[in-house]
C-alpha cells in the first residue's frame, strides 16, 4: 500500500478530475496542495455532474476526508459559493469531511482587482499572460512578500488590523501607480469579517493531521491542479501559473515529507491542449484541430474558454516524466482520436537547423522551435467505453505502446470516456 500523487503532465485539462475520482474511491484522504480556484474539473457520478474548482474531489464521496493544504491560495467567497453549490446538489460539506490548513493564504477582492487591472494593461501592450483574473498570482506574491492574510488570521481579530495595514501599504502604492483608487482599511476588515464564521470551522493544523493519519495507515491521494508545463519554474515561462505544479510540491504544499508521497501518476491526454497564451509547438489550426476540439469538448471548466488543440507532444511529456519522477501515466481521451486516418506524435524539434530532443526554456527559442513528427496509422473502430485491452483496435494499442516508449513511462490506467468506469486498469497505483 502506498500514497499516490496525481499531477498533470501537459498544460492542464488532461482529465485529472475523472482519474482522481476513480482513485478517491480507494483513498481515505484527498489533498489539494497548490493552486486556487483557477483550474476546475468536472466529476460525473451516477449521471450527475459536479463542477469543482477549489474543493478536493473526495468531498463528493461519503466517508472520505478532503483536505486543502497550505500550498493552496483560498478565495473564501469562492469556497463558500462552491460549498453552497454542492449543497444544492445534495452534497453536504462539513468540518467532518473537509479540513483547511490554518496557514493557507487567502485571496481577497483586492487580489482579483489587481489581476484584472494588470491583464487589461497587458492586453493593450500585447504582453498579456492570459490569467483567469481570479487573483491567484497577486495572492501568491503577497505570500512570498510575507504580507499575506492567512486562514488563521480570521481567528485573531486583535492582530488582524496591523496585518491589513501592512497589506494595504503595498497594494495602495501599487494602485496609485496604476491610477486606481485606494482601498480603505475598513473595506478589507469588513470583507474578512463577513467570511470568518463560514471558514473557521474547517480550519486545522494540516501537517499534524496528515502525519497522524499516515502513521495509522491511511491511504492519501494528493490532487494536483493545472499541469507540469504551467509550473512557475518548469513550465513555459512567463505563460505559466503562479505556483509549483510538479509532484514535489505535494510535500511542501501539505506539510508531509517527500518520502510520504509514493506513486507519482501523471495524467496525460492522448493529444495536446492549451488554454490562453503561450508557445504550443504542435498546435493545429486546421480541420484536425477543430475535430479534436469539438470531439473532445475542449472548453475550460472555470472560464469556458476554448482550448487550443494539437498533436501529442512526447518531447514535452518526457520532460514532465523527469521533472515529476512519474511512476506511470493515466492516458486519457484516447476515444477522441477514433476515426482519424493518421496520427502524428512530436518526438523533438528543429532549432537553428539542429534537431533537439527537448523544448528550450528560452521564450525566444521556444517561438522558433519546430516540431519533428512521426506518423502512425489511425483506426476507424470505436474505443468509447472500452474496459479491456481486448476491446481496443490493434492500431490504438500500437499508439499507446508508442507513447509509452517515447515518454519513458508505462501506462497505468487508460481512459476511454468521461464515465469513471470506462477505464482500463493496468496497475493500481495504491497497490504498486
UniProtKB/Swiss-Prot annotation:
One GO biological-process annotation of the entry reads: 'de novo' AMP biosynthetic process
Q: Which compartments does it reside in?
A: Cytoplasm
Q: What class of enzyme is it?
A: ligase
Report which gene this protein is encoded by: purA
Cofactors demanded by this protein: Mg(2+)
For this protein's source organism, the top of the classification is: Bacteria, Pseudomonadati, Pseudomonadota, Alphaproteobacteria, Hyphomicrobiales
Q: Name one GO molecular function term.
A: GTP binding
Q: What is this protein called?
A: Adenylosuccinate synthetase
Q: Which residues form a coiled coil?
A: none
Amino acid at each position: 500500500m502506498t500514497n499516490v500523487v496525481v499531477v498533470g503532465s501537459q498544460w492542464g485539462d488532461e482529465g485529472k478530475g475523472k482519474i482522481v475520482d476513480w482513485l478517491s474511491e480507494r483513498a481515505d484522504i484527498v489533498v489539494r496542495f497548490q493552486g486556487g480556484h483557477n483550474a476546475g474539473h468536472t466529476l460525473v457520478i451516477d449521471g450527475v455532474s459536479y463542477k469543482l474548482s477549489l474543493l478536493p474531489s473526495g468531498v463528493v464521496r461519503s466517508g472520505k476526508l478532503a483536505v486543502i493544504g497550505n500550498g493552496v491560495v483560498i478565495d473564501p467567497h469562492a469556497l463558500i459559493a462552491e460549498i453552497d453549490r454542492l449543497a444544492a446538489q445534495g452534497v453536504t460539506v462539513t468540518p467532518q469531511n473537509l479540513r483547511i490548513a490554518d496557514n493557507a493564504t487567502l485571496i481577497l477582492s483586492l487580489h482579483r482587482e489587481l489581476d484584472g487591472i494588470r491583464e487589461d494593461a497587458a492586453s493593450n501592450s500585447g504582453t498579456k499572460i492570459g490569467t483567469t483574473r481570479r487573483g491567484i498570482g497577486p495572492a501568491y506574491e503577497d505570500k512570498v512578500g510575507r504580507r499575506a492574510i492567512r486562514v488563521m488570521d480570521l481567528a485573531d481579530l486583535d492582530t488582524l488590523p496591523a496585518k491589513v495595514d501592512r497589506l494595504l501599504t503595498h497594494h495602495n502604492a501599487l494602485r496609485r501607480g496604476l491610477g486606481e483608487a485606494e482601498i480603505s482599511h475598513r473595506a478589507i476588515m469588513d470583507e474578512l469579517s463577513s467570511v470568518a464564521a463560514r471558514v473557521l470551522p474547517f480550519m486545522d493544523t494540516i501537517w499534524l493531521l496528515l502525519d497522524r493519519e499516515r502513521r495509522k495507515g491511511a491511504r492519501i491521494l494528493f490532487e494536483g491542479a493545472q499541469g507540469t508545463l504551467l509550473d512557475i519554474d518548469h513550465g513555459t515561462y512567463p505563460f505559466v501559473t503562479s505556483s509549483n505544479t510538479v509532484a514535489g510540491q505535494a510535500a511542501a504544499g501539505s506539510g508531509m515529507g517527500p518520502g510520504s508521497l509514493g506513486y507519482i501518476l501523471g495524467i496525460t491526454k492522448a493529444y495536446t491542449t492549451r488554454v490562453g497564451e503561450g508557445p504550443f509547438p504542435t498546435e493545429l489550426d486546421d480541420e484536425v484541430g477543430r475535430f479534436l476540439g469539438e470531439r473532445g469538448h475542449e472548453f475550460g471548466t472555470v472560464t469556458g474558454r476554448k482550448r487550443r488543440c494539437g498533436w501529442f507532444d512526447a518531447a514535452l511529456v518526457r520532460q514532465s516524466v523527469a521533472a515529476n519522477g512519474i511512476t506511470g501515466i493515466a492516458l486519457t481521451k484516447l476515444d477522441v482520436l477514433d476515426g482519424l486516418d493518421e496520427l502524428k506524435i512530436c518526438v523533438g524539434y528543429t532549432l537553428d537547423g539542429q534537431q533537439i530532443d527537448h523544448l528550450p526554456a528560452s521564450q525566444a527559442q521556444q517561438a522558433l522551435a519546430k516540431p519533428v513528427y512521426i506518423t502512425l496509422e489511425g483506426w476507424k473502430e470505436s474505443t468509447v467505453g472500452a474496459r479491456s485491452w481486448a476491446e481496443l483496435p490493434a492500431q490504438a494499442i500500437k499508439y499507446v505502446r508508442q507513447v509509452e516508449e517515447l515518454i519513458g513511462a508505462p501506462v497505468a490506467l487508460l481512459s476511454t470516456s468521461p464515465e469513471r468506469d470506462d477505464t482500463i486498469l493496468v496497475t493500481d497505483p495504491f497497490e504498486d
